[in-house]
A protein has these predicted regions:
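N-terminal non-catalytic structural scaffold regions of very large proteins
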Residues: 1-240
């Protein structure tokens, strides 16, 4: 229903875009609570059924199918309807392959001054297990080739996007096409310059991802002797 609101011409254009954001927020909450609860139930080997009589694995499979279809629909609405409509109103989002030479120079300077100093690559190897990344944060997993400054062979690394920076940045007016206000994505800037964060190494792949963590409270007051302590433990686990 929320997605259909994004297609309704009766709503102002930015409100229609907002409906896509609401849909994403709703999906996050659904996966944090409902899907997380199902996965926890499956992990415990609990095959108790719901009111509809279906097993947890069957419910999870159906959720996956429906969610994938809805996400595809969401991006169709964004790319085929809303972004062209925004562009017709003079608002444009520049992809990496659309940057002009002057825009690339501006992005390079911004990356050097504002992004590189606050981004901390995390190596992945047997001595460094997968890190505890912040819930719903933007990250990149990077495939590397070559050796670093310490002579270590390349492998995999994670780039957490700085949370102190906005996801969208406006290009200076003199760099925009005539009649347009243009923006670039933080993710595009990191992707374009990821190799500069690994001197002496070659980036063979750079892939954007985010984690949605379990936010379902799983404390049973009948099974713990100290409910307050159990709740504190659950809350401490939410630091990420």
């Amino acid at each position: 229903r929320v997605l259909e609101q994004a297609l309704d011409d009766a709503h102002p254009l930015l409100n229609r875009l907002m409906f896509l954001l609401i849909f994403s927020s709703n999906m996050d909450e659904f996966f944090e609570i409902r899907v997380a609860g199902l996965k926890h139930q499956i992990a415990l080997g609990d095959d108790s059924t719901g009111a509809d009589g279906r097993l947890p694995k069957a419910v999870l499979a159906e959720i996956s199918e429906i969610a994938h279809a809805q996400i595809v629909r969401q991006y169709e609405i964004l790319n085929d309807t809303l972004l062209p409509a925004l562009e017709a109103q003079g608002l444009r989002f520049r992809r990496r392959d659309q940057w002009t030479k002057a825009q690339k120079d501006w992005v390079q300077e911004l990356f050097n001054n504002d992004i590189m100093p606050v981004i901390s690559p995390i190596g992945l190897d047997p001595s460094h297990p997968f890190p505890r990344l912040v819930n719903k944060s933007l990250n990149f997993i990077v495939e590397l080739e070559g050796k670093d400054a310490f002579g270590r062979a390349g492998g995999m690394a994670i780039l957490p996007a700085p949370r102190s920076l906005p996801r969208l940045m406006a290009l200076p007016k003199h760099l925009c096409s005539e009649g347009f206000t243009e923006y670039v994505f933080l993710s595009s800037m990191i992707h374009a310059h990821a190799e500069e964060l690994f001197p002496g190494m070659k980036v063979r792949g750079c892939y954007q991802f985010r984690l949605t963590r379990n936010a379902d409270m799983s404390v049973d007051p009948e099974e713990v002797s100290d409910l307050a302590s159990a709740l504190r433990g659950e809350l401490l686990a939410r630091r990420y």
